[in-house]
């Protein structure tokens, strides 16, 4: 990976694959197409996904400082 943003792109793919796009959208109470449009997981959604307990915030978005 060339930088942390590229890593965040890969982490988005990993997390969506683990939860499933449709299931993740239901857990976040948003539409499935909204999840599909993400290049990386938005900061607010990263907080919500971290609250599920499987991934830490820093893992989900390594390109941001929290």
Predicted ranges, named:
Residues 23-25, 35, 49:
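Short alpha-helical "recognition helix" segments of helix-turn-helix
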Residues 28-42:
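Recognition helix of helix-turn-helix/homeodomain-like DNA-binding domains
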Residues 21, 32, 46:
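Helix-turn-helix DNA-binding elements, focusing on the entry/boundary residues of the two helices
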Residues 41, 64-66:
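Short active-site-proximal "capping" loops at secondary-structure junctions
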Residues 43-60:
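DNA major-groove recognition helix of helix-turn-helix/homeodomain DNA-binding modules
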Residues 1-23, 55-64:
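A short, Lys/Arg-rich alpha-helix, primarily the initiator
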Residues 13-14, 29, 46:
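Exposed boundary/loop context
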